[in-house]
Protein backbone atom coordinates (compact mmCIF):
# COMPACT_ATOMS: atom_id res chain seq x y z
CA UNK A 1 0.00 0.00 0.00
CA UNK A 2 1.22 3.48 -0.90
CA UNK A 3 2.57 5.63 1.93
CA UNK A 4 1.46 9.26 2.25
CA UNK A 5 3.41 12.46 2.87
CA UNK A 6 1.68 15.77 3.55
CA UNK A 7 3.72 18.90 2.85
CA UNK A 8 2.42 21.87 4.85
CA UNK A 9 3.09 25.48 3.86
CA UNK A 10 2.34 28.43 1.63
CA UNK A 11 2.46 28.99 -2.11
CA UNK A 12 2.44 32.59 -3.36
CA UNK A 13 1.93 34.41 -6.64
CA UNK A 14 5.36 35.36 -7.99
CA UNK A 15 5.99 38.44 -10.13
CA UNK A 16 9.48 38.69 -11.62
CA UNK A 17 11.22 41.00 -14.06
CA UNK A 18 12.10 39.64 -17.48
CA UNK A 19 13.76 42.51 -19.33
CA UNK A 20 11.17 45.29 -19.48
CA UNK A 21 8.33 42.84 -18.84
CA UNK A 22 6.92 41.33 -15.67
CA UNK A 23 6.40 37.57 -15.64
CA UNK A 24 3.84 35.87 -13.39
CA UNK A 25 4.32 32.48 -11.80
CA UNK A 26 3.98 30.93 -8.36
CA UNK A 27 6.38 29.67 -5.75
CA UNK A 28 7.02 28.71 -2.17
CA UNK A 29 9.65 26.61 -0.43
CA UNK A 30 7.35 23.75 0.57
CA UNK A 31 5.50 23.75 -2.76
CA UNK A 32 8.83 23.42 -4.58
CA UNK A 33 9.72 20.45 -2.38
CA UNK A 34 6.34 18.76 -2.90
CA UNK A 35 6.57 19.05 -6.70
CA UNK A 36 10.12 17.69 -6.82
CA UNK A 37 9.25 14.76 -4.55
CA UNK A 38 6.20 13.92 -6.69
CA UNK A 39 8.31 13.98 -9.86
CA UNK A 40 10.79 11.47 -8.45
CA UNK A 41 8.63 8.82 -6.78
CA UNK A 42 6.27 6.14 -7.97
CA UNK A 43 2.79 7.09 -6.65
CA UNK A 44 2.32 3.40 -5.85
CA UNK A 45 5.09 3.81 -3.26
CA UNK A 46 4.47 7.37 -2.01
CA UNK A 47 1.70 9.89 -2.66
CA UNK A 48 2.38 13.60 -2.12
CA UNK A 49 -0.28 15.89 -0.62
CA UNK A 50 0.02 19.68 -0.29
CA UNK A 51 -1.70 21.32 2.67
CA UNK A 52 -2.40 25.06 2.54
CA UNK A 53 -5.26 27.51 2.06
CA UNK A 54 -6.08 29.53 -1.04
CA UNK A 55 -8.81 31.93 -2.12
CA UNK A 56 -11.71 31.31 -4.48
CA UNK A 57 -10.10 33.54 -7.13
CA UNK A 58 -8.76 32.59 -10.56
CA UNK A 59 -5.10 32.79 -9.43
CA UNK A 60 -5.82 30.18 -6.74
CA UNK A 61 -7.56 27.96 -9.29
CA UNK A 62 -4.56 28.20 -11.64
CA UNK A 63 -2.29 27.10 -8.79
CA UNK A 64 -4.49 24.09 -8.05
CA UNK A 65 -4.61 23.13 -11.72
CA UNK A 66 -0.80 23.30 -11.94
CA UNK A 67 -0.36 21.15 -8.81
CA UNK A 68 -2.78 18.54 -10.14
CA UNK A 69 -0.63 18.43 -13.27
CA UNK A 70 2.35 17.56 -11.04
CA UNK A 71 0.56 14.64 -9.32
CA UNK A 72 0.31 16.61 -6.08
CA UNK A 73 -2.91 15.79 -4.21
CA UNK A 74 -4.80 18.92 -3.09
CA UNK A 75 -7.77 17.32 -1.34
CA UNK A 76 -6.59 18.86 1.97
CA UNK A 77 -6.07 22.35 0.52
CA UNK A 78 -8.81 24.73 1.62
CA UNK A 79 -10.51 27.45 -0.45
CA UNK A 80 -11.43 30.53 1.59
CA UNK A 81 -13.96 33.21 0.65
CA UNK A 82 -12.62 36.79 0.91
CA UNK A 83 -8.99 35.62 1.07
CA UNK A 84 -6.27 35.60 -1.58
CA UNK A 85 -2.87 33.97 -2.00
CA UNK A 86 0.14 36.01 -0.89
CA UNK A 87 2.22 37.83 -3.50
CA UNK A 88 5.91 38.58 -3.92
CA UNK A 89 7.88 40.58 -6.46
CA UNK A 90 11.48 39.82 -7.47
CA UNK A 91 13.50 42.86 -8.55
CA UNK A 92 16.83 42.08 -10.25
CA UNK A 93 19.61 44.67 -10.50
CA UNK A 94 22.26 45.00 -13.22
CA UNK A 95 24.58 42.51 -11.47
CA UNK A 96 21.86 39.84 -11.22
CA UNK A 97 21.38 40.40 -7.48
CA UNK A 98 17.75 39.89 -6.46
CA UNK A 99 15.59 41.82 -3.99
CA UNK A 100 12.28 40.37 -2.79
CA UNK A 101 9.17 42.35 -1.84
CA UNK A 102 6.28 40.57 -0.09
CA UNK A 103 2.55 41.16 0.33
CA UNK A 104 1.25 38.34 2.53
CA UNK A 105 -0.38 39.79 5.68
CA UNK A 106 -3.88 38.67 4.69
CA UNK A 107 -2.84 35.57 2.73
CA UNK A 108 -5.23 32.63 3.07
CA UNK A 109 -2.41 30.24 4.07
CA UNK A 110 -1.94 32.08 7.38
CA UNK A 111 -5.42 31.05 8.46
CA UNK A 112 -5.61 27.38 7.43
CA UNK A 113 -5.78 26.22 11.06
CA UNK A 114 -8.50 28.74 12.00
CA UNK A 115 -11.27 27.54 9.68
CA UNK A 116 -14.24 25.28 10.40
CA UNK A 117 -12.68 22.52 8.28
CA UNK A 118 -9.30 22.59 10.05
CA UNK A 119 -10.24 20.08 12.79
CA UNK A 120 -11.28 17.44 10.23
CA UNK A 121 -8.14 18.11 8.17
CA UNK A 122 -5.91 17.72 11.24
CA UNK A 123 -7.69 14.50 12.15
CA UNK A 124 -6.82 13.11 8.72
CA UNK A 125 -3.23 14.40 8.81
CA UNK A 126 -2.63 12.75 12.19
CA UNK A 127 -2.78 9.39 10.40
CA UNK A 128 -0.32 10.21 7.60
CA UNK A 129 3.00 8.38 7.36
CA UNK A 130 5.00 11.61 7.02
CA UNK A 131 4.39 15.31 7.68
CA UNK A 132 6.84 17.84 6.21
CA UNK A 133 7.07 21.55 6.99
CA UNK A 134 9.57 24.40 7.08
CA UNK A 135 10.38 27.36 9.27
CA UNK A 136 8.23 29.46 6.95
CA UNK A 137 5.25 27.12 7.51
CA UNK A 138 5.56 28.01 11.21
CA UNK A 139 6.43 31.69 10.79
CA UNK A 140 3.28 32.70 8.91
CA UNK A 141 0.95 31.34 11.62
CA UNK A 142 -0.45 33.06 14.70
CA UNK A 143 0.85 31.71 18.06
CA UNK A 144 -2.49 29.89 18.57
CA UNK A 145 -2.28 28.22 15.16
CA UNK A 146 1.34 27.26 15.82
CA UNK A 147 0.29 25.45 18.99
CA UNK A 148 -2.40 23.59 17.03
CA UNK A 149 0.19 22.58 14.44
CA UNK A 150 2.68 21.36 17.06
CA UNK A 151 -0.12 19.33 18.69
CA UNK A 152 -0.90 17.77 15.32
CA UNK A 153 2.75 16.81 14.81
CA UNK A 154 2.92 15.18 18.24
CA UNK A 155 -0.29 13.27 17.57
CA UNK A 156 0.98 12.05 14.20
CA UNK A 157 4.18 10.75 15.83
CA UNK A 158 2.16 9.05 18.57
CA UNK A 159 0.28 7.27 15.77
CA UNK A 160 3.57 6.03 14.26
CA UNK A 161 4.11 8.79 11.70
CA UNK A 162 7.35 10.72 11.15
CA UNK A 163 7.85 14.49 11.10
CA UNK A 164 10.33 16.19 8.77
CA UNK A 165 11.46 19.80 9.28
CA UNK A 166 13.50 22.21 7.14
CA UNK A 167 14.92 25.06 9.21
CA UNK A 168 14.30 27.69 6.48
CA UNK A 169 14.61 30.86 8.61
CA UNK A 170 13.28 34.24 7.43
CA UNK A 171 13.88 36.82 10.21
CA UNK A 172 11.39 39.35 8.79
CA UNK A 173 8.53 36.86 9.35
CA UNK A 174 9.18 36.59 13.09
CA UNK A 175 8.56 39.03 15.97
CA UNK A 176 12.01 38.35 17.45
CA UNK A 177 14.93 35.95 17.37
CA UNK A 178 13.99 34.76 20.87
CA UNK A 179 10.49 33.82 19.71
CA UNK A 180 11.93 31.87 16.78
CA UNK A 181 14.40 30.01 18.98
CA UNK A 182 11.62 29.00 21.35
CA UNK A 183 9.35 27.77 18.52
CA UNK A 184 12.19 25.97 16.70
CA UNK A 185 13.19 24.21 19.92
CA UNK A 186 9.60 22.95 20.34
CA UNK A 187 9.58 21.95 16.69
CA UNK A 188 12.84 19.99 16.90
CA UNK A 189 11.53 18.11 19.94
CA UNK A 190 8.86 16.54 17.69
CA UNK A 191 11.03 16.11 14.56
CA UNK A 192 12.44 12.83 13.18
CA UNK A 193 14.41 14.17 10.19
CA UNK A 194 15.80 17.74 10.20
CA UNK A 195 17.23 19.55 7.17
CA UNK A 196 19.55 22.32 8.32
CA UNK A 197 21.13 25.08 6.24
CA UNK A 198 24.17 26.40 8.09
CA UNK A 199 23.54 30.04 7.10
CA UNK A 200 20.11 29.84 8.73
CA UNK A 201 21.50 28.11 11.82
CA UNK A 202 24.21 30.78 12.20
CA UNK A 203 21.69 33.61 11.75
CA UNK A 204 19.38 32.18 14.41
CA UNK A 205 21.70 30.66 17.01
CA UNK A 206 25.05 32.36 16.33
CA UNK A 207 28.00 30.87 14.49
CA UNK A 208 29.07 27.47 15.80
CA UNK A 209 31.14 24.57 14.44
CA UNK A 210 28.99 22.22 12.39
CA UNK A 211 29.64 19.38 14.87
CA UNK A 212 28.06 21.50 17.62
CA UNK A 213 25.04 22.31 15.43
CA UNK A 214 24.50 18.60 14.76
CA UNK A 215 24.95 17.70 18.45
CA UNK A 216 22.47 20.39 19.55
CA UNK A 217 19.89 19.10 17.06
CA UNK A 218 20.33 15.49 18.19
CA UNK A 219 20.05 16.62 21.82
CA UNK A 220 16.66 18.14 21.03
CA UNK A 221 15.52 14.64 20.05
CA UNK A 222 16.06 14.57 16.26
CA UNK A 223 17.30 11.17 15.04
CA UNK A 224 18.39 12.09 11.49
CA UNK A 225 20.15 15.41 10.84
CA UNK A 226 20.93 16.48 7.27
CA UNK A 227 23.18 19.54 6.89
CA UNK A 228 22.88 21.25 3.50
CA UNK A 229 25.98 23.23 2.55
CA UNK A 230 25.22 24.49 -0.96
CA UNK A 231 28.03 23.67 -3.37
CA UNK A 232 29.94 21.85 -0.62
CA UNK A 233 29.35 18.30 0.58
CA UNK A 234 26.28 17.40 2.60
CA UNK A 235 26.57 15.89 6.06
CA UNK A 236 24.13 13.27 7.35
CA UNK A 237 24.22 12.28 11.00
CA UNK A 238 21.98 9.47 12.24
CA UNK A 239 21.88 8.98 16.01
CA UNK A 240 23.98 5.97 16.94
CA UNK A 241 25.36 5.51 13.41
CA UNK A 242 27.94 8.27 12.96
CA UNK A 243 28.46 10.87 10.24
CA UNK A 244 28.24 10.44 6.45
CA UNK A 245 29.90 13.08 4.24
CA UNK A 246 28.49 13.07 0.68
CA UNK A 247 30.22 15.23 -1.97
CA UNK A 248 28.14 17.65 -4.04
CA UNK A 249 27.88 17.55 -7.84
CA UNK A 250 30.41 20.07 -9.14
CA UNK A 251 29.22 22.41 -11.91
CA UNK A 252 31.17 24.97 -13.95
CA UNK A 253 30.26 28.50 -12.78
CA UNK A 254 28.63 29.41 -16.10
CA UNK A 255 26.16 26.52 -15.72
CA UNK A 256 24.68 27.95 -12.51
CA UNK A 257 21.73 30.11 -13.60
CA UNK A 258 19.40 30.42 -10.60
CA UNK A 259 19.80 28.99 -7.09
CA UNK A 260 16.24 29.89 -5.99
CA UNK A 261 15.06 26.36 -5.18
CA UNK A 262 18.40 24.62 -4.60
CA UNK A 263 17.74 23.74 -0.96
CA UNK A 264 14.08 22.84 -1.52
CA UNK A 265 14.94 20.50 -4.39
CA UNK A 266 17.82 18.89 -2.45
CA UNK A 267 15.39 17.99 0.34
CA UNK A 268 12.97 16.57 -2.24
CA UNK A 269 15.62 14.38 -3.87
CA UNK A 270 16.77 13.15 -0.47
CA UNK A 271 13.25 12.26 0.65
CA UNK A 272 12.28 10.65 -2.67
CA UNK A 273 14.96 8.03 -1.96
CA UNK A 274 14.92 7.91 1.83
CA UNK A 275 11.15 7.55 2.28
CA UNK A 276 10.99 4.73 -0.25
CA UNK A 277 13.60 2.56 1.46
CA UNK A 278 16.94 3.98 0.28
CA UNK A 279 20.04 4.60 2.42
CA UNK A 280 20.96 8.05 3.74
CA UNK A 281 24.02 8.12 1.47
CA UNK A 282 22.01 7.29 -1.67
CA UNK A 283 19.39 9.83 -0.58
CA UNK A 284 22.02 12.57 -0.24
CA UNK A 285 23.44 11.72 -3.67
CA UNK A 286 19.97 12.08 -5.17
CA UNK A 287 19.53 15.36 -3.31
CA UNK A 288 22.74 16.74 -4.81
CA UNK A 289 21.80 15.52 -8.29
CA UNK A 290 18.34 17.10 -8.08
CA UNK A 291 19.65 20.44 -6.80
CA UNK A 292 22.50 20.57 -9.32
CA UNK A 293 19.96 20.08 -12.13
CA UNK A 294 17.46 22.66 -10.83
CA UNK A 295 20.04 25.46 -10.53
CA UNK A 296 20.84 25.18 -14.24
CA UNK A 297 17.41 26.66 -15.08
CA UNK A 298 15.67 29.93 -14.30
CA UNK A 299 12.79 29.76 -11.82
CA UNK A 300 11.93 27.50 -8.91
CA UNK A 301 10.15 24.80 -10.93
CA UNK A 302 12.13 23.59 -13.94
CA UNK A 303 10.62 21.89 -17.02
CA UNK A 304 9.64 18.30 -16.25
CA UNK A 305 11.72 16.99 -19.17
CA UNK A 306 14.84 18.56 -17.59
CA UNK A 307 14.61 16.34 -14.49
CA UNK A 308 17.49 13.89 -13.94
CA UNK A 309 16.79 10.25 -14.81
Swiss-Prot record:
Keywords: ATP-binding, Carbohydrate metabolism, Kinase, Nucleotide-binding, Transferase. One of its GO terms (cellular component) is cytosol. Substrate binds at residues 28-32, 88, 102-104, 170, 264. Optimum pH is around 6. One of its GO terms (molecular function) is 2-dehydro-3-deoxygluconokinase activity. CDD domains: KdgK. Catalyzes the phosphorylation of 2-keto-3-deoxygluconate (KDG) to produce 2-keto-3-deoxy-6-phosphogluconate (KDPG). This is 2-dehydro-3-deoxygluconokinase. It comes from Escherichia coli (strain K12). It catalyses: 2-dehydro-3-deoxy-D-gluconate + ATP = 2-dehydro-3-deoxy-6-phospho-D-gluconate + ADP + H(+). Pathway: Carbohydrate acid metabolism; 2-dehydro-3-deoxy-D-gluconate degradation; D-glyceraldehyde 3-phosphate and pyruvate from 2-dehydro-3-deoxy-D-gluconate: step 1/2. One of its GO terms (biological process) is D-galacturonate catabolic process.
